[in-house]
């Protein structure tokens, strides 16, 4: 499952807010290699994103029609511009002339189309095809019910791409800034082994060049659309002896994410404190329900389990003081104006809801199994036992086995840590709760939700806050998930490193980063 995050990962996702080193773009001068403590590298293929670490790496190796600036706004990349029809259903992208892949081969509008169709092709088995589900015909293509020609993606000529949408989507320019939609060379096929280090071909600011022990070495791509990046070499540090803080203090790495419990003392350290920077959270952890089977096919039961939890009290107990209780699956950094989720708990109403659902005798619920892989679930489980009188059991397993379980038989209650694909509420509501979405793990289907979500997607700037507030109110009432916590991220940043800015969803675009001259 893509974009799921491990709680113990080297880097959590967030919006990196640096008080120093922000810049509008690359500056001249290569300087020394940048050593980024990233953890072991994963896939080299945008079709097979597994977690936040993959997203981070692929952002360096490939490019799409747009990219995100320091404010999280899309700006032209492979596309020089675009026109949007009055009804918001047709996007015409102007692809830049004379684009090249890193090996010098031409990159045209047909390569964009081919890359997107490969993502949607069920034979590929991509992990994130549903990012393009708003495109006409994409859902049927993903299901194997239609062919490439039925998808609303047309390369008119080398420099013109036309995309037709099922409904207006104000966030579509953000979608095409996500690595899953980035352009891969013609050698890409439906396997995961076509891309190798000894013959790497990409479209981004860097190329994967070699491994050095546990590190992956990235070299600047002179053929990148924005020109060769300022730093010639990135060391993708795969492992270290000891913790991230010790490695940074010893000068072994230049950029490292650190956990909140370290940040609490680092902030007071005379040497490290000035180099510590907070990141606004853009990850969400939540409890999900198998909504296809009793008792959680009944929204009253789901709502009861949600109302029983005083998250403002429980989250610090379970996740630590650096975590923030979540009232919505949409992180605060991308809340539209007027969006204010409710965190309130009401155990008495929760008990009444269970009674109304026919479970006055709690034993009729049976033993409710919670899969605790990824979250500290015990405080919540204790409340469900004590406040609701429900018999609870907790199961844990390896992360890999948990992913397999979500695909085949979701537990009655499961836990997920998630990073947004792009800075829009739709990146959470659509990809996690829309019917047919690969990451709708609880298989929730609700026509009223679909209607509200489509209305929010098409809302104008002055209406978007109210439209998504209506979506949130309905999701809160139906409770297909229980939002749990937003995880705060902290970074240690070497002196002289510039261009990190306010990078949305924690994705560090090293093509825009430089050292002081």
Model-flagged regions — what are they?
Residues 324-357, 372, 376:
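Structural transition elements
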Residues 355-420, 489:
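Ligand/substrate-recognition segments at binding pockets and active sites
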Residues 491-517:
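Long beta-strand-rich cores associated with HINT superfamily self-processing modules
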Residues 94, 111, 120, 124-186:
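Surface-exposed binding/hinge segments that line
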Residues 154, 315, 390-407, 416, ...:
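Extracytoplasmic/peripheral linker and loop segments enriched in polar/acidic and small residues
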Residues 149, 154, 165-229, 233, ...:
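Gly/Pro-rich hinge or "lid" segments in bacterial periplasmic/extracellular proteins
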Residues 194, 214, 222-266:
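Ligand-site clamp/hinge motif
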Residues 37-86, 117, 201, 507:
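N-terminal lobe/hinge region of extracytoplasmic solute-binding protein
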